[in-house]
Amino acid sequence: MVNLNPKRSDEPVWWGLFGAGGTWFAMLTPVTILVLGIMVPLGILDADAMSYERVSGFVTSFIGALFTIATLALPMWHAMHRLHHGMHDLKFHTGVVGKIACYATAFLVSALAIIFVFMI
């Protein structure tokens, strides 16, 4: 018999954020670390390109704000989803409390990223 009223799951939302965060972390974070953590300190890129005025101008632009928020928020959603399911795999059955704690942490970091970007 087919259940005509199946229970809706919220899991596709979390898996979507998990996938987006994993993709962002794998594709864009290494480039960001290369540029900001290696090329600028070694002098390969001009330090004036990373002056406060230029960075502030980038972060306060629409594309820069989206990039900064996504760089902070998406990997956090990925990490918290992985932590939530990792606890389950390790037999730490925290239930709804663990789910709320993990995703609330990711939401808090996302909200703080948005707030801090608009404070600049």
Curated annotation (Swiss-Prot):
InterPro entries per the record? Fumarate_red_D, SQR/QFR_C/D
Q: Look up the domain of life of the source.
A: Bacteria
Query: What does the record give under GO molecular function?
Result: succinate dehydrogenase activity
Query: Looking at the UniProt record for this protein, which Gene Ontology cellular component terms does it annotate, in alphabetical order?
Result: fumarate reductase complex; plasma membrane
Q: Quote the subcellular location field of this record.
A: Cell inner membrane
- Transmembrane regions: 25-45, 57-77, 100-120
Q: Which GO terms describe its biological process?
A: fumarate metabolic process
The topology of this chain with respect to the membrane is: Multi-pass membrane protein
Q: Which CDD domains match?
A: QFR_TypeD_subunitD (cd00547)
Q: Which residues form the signal peptide?
A: none
Q: Which Pfam families match?
A: Fumarate_red_D
Oligomeric and partner information = Part of an enzyme complex containing four subunits: a flavoprotein (FrdA), an iron-sulfur protein (FrdB), and two hydrophobic anchor proteins (FrdC and FrdD).
Known role: Anchors the catalytic components of the fumarate reductase complex to the cell membrane, binds quinones.
Protein family (similarity comment): Belongs to the FrdD family.
Q: What is this protein called?
A: Fumarate reductase subunit D
Q: What gene is this protein translated from?
A: frdD
